[in-house]
Amino acid sequence: SIHPATLTQADFLRGRLGYAVYDMAGAPDAIRRDMQNLPGTVVLISSPAQGAASAPDRTYARALGQIAREVFGPLNAGALILTGGETAYSVLDALGLRVIDLEDEPLEGVAAGWAEGILVMTKSGGFGGEEALHALAVYAAKRLGIHRDST
């Protein structure tokens, strides 16, 4: 999502240990370059803050869908945290994930479930405080049996 709340949440993760934050423009190449260092890392692909008001969510959502299709398989990711309806739809569609078996609400207003063995969480782009994405990443790690520092 390009909503200011989501951009604030992405900024909260920048520079924190265990997180790799990529801007959309160079994400596929940068992720491929860093792939050997990414296992156990939360990878966030963020929309650029500048220009966010001039390009529709749909444009960024489609681009994220294409990026997910390019890099998701090689990363063998265990979870997806998707922000914004257009983003969620585009990424899930690009990955061929059609059904999510919902089972939890890790934060108020955030749906979580499983799609073909992948933990999927979706939230509105404008929802949550600055620590929301971090809290969801910690939740995902616990569900996947990965020990992560919760701070």
Residue spans of the language-model regions?
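Active-site catalytic microenvironments in core metabolic enzymes, especially phosphate/sugar-handling
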Residues: 1-151
